[in-house]
Amino acid sequence: MKKGTRINILTGAAIVPLFLMNLIIGSVDIPVADVFSILCGNGSDKASWEYIVMQARLPQAVTAVLCGSSLAVSGLLLQTAFRNPLAGPSIFGINSGASLGVALVMLAFGGGVTVGTVSLTGFMAVLVAAFIGAGAVMALLLMFAARVRNNVMLLIIGIMVGYIASSAISLLNFFATEEGVHSYMVWGLGNFGGVPMSQIPIFAVITAAGLILSILQIKPLNTLLLGEQYAENLGVNTLHLRNWLLVITGLLTATATAFCGPIAFIGLAVPHIARLMLGTDDHRQLIPGTIIMGAVVALACNIICVLPGNGGIIPLNAVTPVMGAPVILYVIMKGRR
């Protein structure tokens, strides 16, 4: 068995205790025996514990796994496609597009939108708005990508699109009500606990589709590591591959942002953690390793968020930079050497 495979198996095994800890730890500590009993369908003496586990903590843990995996793989695909170790899902403005969509709903329309006979409010309004915002930015980027071959120029375009979206959000914040600004700020802090159990299957199906499409790109991604010219000599259409990777990362990032809010650093840092652990750039090991590591990091971050217990929940985006920034600093210093 190869070293990378062994490490991926061991890292994957770590998901089980971390997932279980997410079900146990919180403002109410639930014994392990009761958690297992509830998961097995035998219930618990306390009905409130059953509700907490099945309707709050279980969807939260599943959301962490899905979001962590999708953002991590998105970062890996972009770092390989653009040969830039600091590329991440947020660099192309997809997060900003989703945020702009949510800002329009929360700040301009008061939390709900009515189109004809269809009325969307609350979570569904935010979800649809985030998808539309991210999709609009994705369409804009693909339009530019069809005309711009230079990867650096496309990166700059993505950054500029993000700045424009951020500027629009700032204007909306300025003219919005205090309640609207507060709601938007809470969403912007990121949260794995906002997805109801009824929405988990939708989240899981879209994420699984994106991850499968990513795995199918392993061979051309490995060829791309040898250089664009070499890859084209081997029959890889690098422009088509780049645009296809943008579509995959757009799908994964838009989905994660729509369901969980803009999550920082996971997409940027986790691919580097996977590379450091596996010691290889081979995507046959790296993509599965990044998927697993993304889930592990997201679950660990969620545990840290709920550690205060009755003291409240730490915002997710206050935890992810603490875990991700040291990794990025290490990569930068290593690059200088």
Task: Name what the model sees in each region.
Residues 1-337:
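Alpha-helical transmembrane segments in inner-membrane proteins
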